């Protein structure tokens, strides 16, 4: 029937890698997947919207104890850490009580916020909740994204737009957004805006260019994160661009 698939999931194993990095026996996998979901939900509820762009979970084993390392990518590192790391330590305590395991949190500061679909979608949803006119919000978001150097962007919004009695769908796009080209580096995000006249759905699709042979997704994006493996690095470790990220492990 021609239903659209999630652009992020469609590219997993091809040009993208997973945000949960661990391996275990088959019997434990469902439990650990559920545990990851609880951790992500707790983190998202702990902080306000438009702060966290990505959450990575890594599970390590030291002797018989399981150790969890969480990488947070944020545009507002001060809110995540808080004064004297109070917010960060409070989050660690909550997660350790939830899963009864030791947790370490690493924080990376994202600079190019207009190129990340999650942050763009969250910012649009926040403005819609503040009763801003949706067409002006979409045009402003697209202009800022195009100025940051992306190849194309598409934003779709559905619901009772402008408080209309009948729900409808509106979209605006500029540039090239090839959803079915697997080598195209497509960043996709969905967010909900809860307004007084109902829930509005916001979808943001950003095209960063094509991942050509002998290149990785890190070459198409000017912002690098540990989600995107740098295959040119001999030790196969993940690469963080110092120009766009600042790491805090205090």
From Swiss-Prot:
Keyword field contains Protein biosynthesis: no
Outcome of mutating residue 46 to Y: In strain: AL202, AT4 and PV259
GO MF entries: mRNA binding; rRNA binding; structural constituent of ribosome
Domain named KH type-2: residues: 39-111
PROSITE patterns: KH_TYPE_2, RIBOSOMAL_S3
Disulfide bonds: none
Keyword Transmembrane helix: no
InterPro entries with a match to the protein in the record: KH_dom-like_a/b, KH_dom_type_2, KH_sf_prok-type, Ribosomal_S3_C_sf, Ribosomal_uS3_bac-typ, Ribosomal_uS3_C, Ribosomal_uS3_CS
Biological processes annotated in GO: translation
GO CC term, one of those recorded: cytosolic small ribosomal subunit
SUPFAM superfamilies in the record: Prokaryotic type KH domain (KH-domain type II), Ribosomal protein S3 C-terminal domain
Family: Belongs to the universal ribosomal protein uS3 family.
Function: Binds the lower part of the 30S subunit head. Binds mRNA in the 70S ribosome, positioning it for translation.
Assembly and binders: Part of the 30S ribosomal subunit. Forms a tight complex with proteins S10 and S14.
Protein name per the record: Small ribosomal subunit protein uS3
């Amino acid at each position: 029937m021609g239903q659209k698939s999630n652009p992020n999931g469609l590219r997993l194993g091809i040009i993208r890698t997973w945000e949960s990095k661990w391996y275990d026996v088959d019997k434990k996998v469902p439990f650990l997947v559920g545990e990851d979901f609880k951790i992500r939900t707790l983190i998202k509820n702990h902080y306000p919207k438009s702060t966290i762009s990505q959450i990575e979970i890594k599970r390590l084993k030291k002797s018989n104890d399981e150790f969890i390392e969480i990488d947070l990518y944020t545009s507002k590192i001060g809110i995540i850490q808080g004064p004297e790391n109070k917010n960060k330590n409070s989050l660690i305590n909550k997660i350790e009580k939830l899963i009864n395991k030791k947790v370490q949190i690493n924080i990376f500061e994202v600079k190019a916020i207009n190129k990340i679909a999650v942050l763009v979608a969250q910012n649009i949803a926040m403005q819609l909740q503040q009763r801003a006119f949706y067409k002006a919000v979409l045009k402003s978001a697209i202009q800022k994204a195009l100025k940051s150097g992306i190849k194309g962007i598409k934003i779709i919004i559905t619901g009772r737009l402008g408080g209309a009695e009948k729900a409808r769908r509106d979209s605006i796009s500029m540039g090239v957004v090839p959803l079915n080209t697997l080598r195209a580096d497509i960043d996709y995000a969905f967010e909900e805006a809860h307004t007084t006249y109902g829930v509005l759905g916001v979808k943001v699709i950003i095209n960063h260019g094509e991942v050509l042979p002998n290149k990785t997704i890190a070459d198409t994006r000017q912002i690098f994160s540990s989600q995107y493996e740098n295959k040119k690095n001999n030790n196969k470790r993940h690469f963080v661009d110092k120009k766009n990220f600042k790491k805090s492990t205090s």
